Amino acid sequence: RYRKIYLKKVGNKFQSSILDDHKVIKFLKPKIKLGGCIIDCQSSNFFARRDWFSAVFVARTDLSILYDRLEHKGYTGSSLKNNIECELFEVMLLEAYKSFRPKIVYEIYNNTEEDIVENVEFIISILNKKKSVS
């Protein structure tokens, strides 16, 4: 659940909200310890406890598709440029490989609706495999 109490500030140069990492982790910690959580986050640097995760999926998109999606969402200027550059230079993928054991990092592409369906099936299969091993 998204709660405004976890925001530090709004209105930086990217016109976006900044999460208070400490408050978010404090909120998530008891839930994650129970297991079975799926966390959707833009950055893996956010989590100090790498052992919380059995799989990390990095969603990628072709640049032309990403550009159109971001424009459609109203991204402009530095926000648009930063998002495109992050994808171009594989920032999130490299961050995930640096932050977690490479064998638990999976790169998936979300270019089409078919990709999304295939990715859901792939993610479920990976999680089921990990569940049967543990």
Describe each region flagged by the PLM:
Residues 1-48:
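ATP-dependent small-molecule kinase phosphotransfer cores
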Residues 20, 24-28, 32, 96, ...:
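Generic hydrophobic alpha-helical segments
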Residues 35-36, 54, 105:
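Conserved acidic residues
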Residues 42-45, 62-64, 113:
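Short glycine-rich anion-binding loops that position phosphate/pyrophosphate groups of nucleotides
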Residues 47-50, 93:
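Conserved ATPase-coupling elements of RecA-like P-loop NTPase cores
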Residues 51-56, 112-114:
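Short, electropositive alpha-helical surface patch
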Residues 56, 60-103:
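A glycine- and Lys/Arg-enriched "phosphate-lid" helix/loop adjacent to the NTP-binding pocket
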Residues 72, 97-134:
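NTP-dependent small-molecule kinase module
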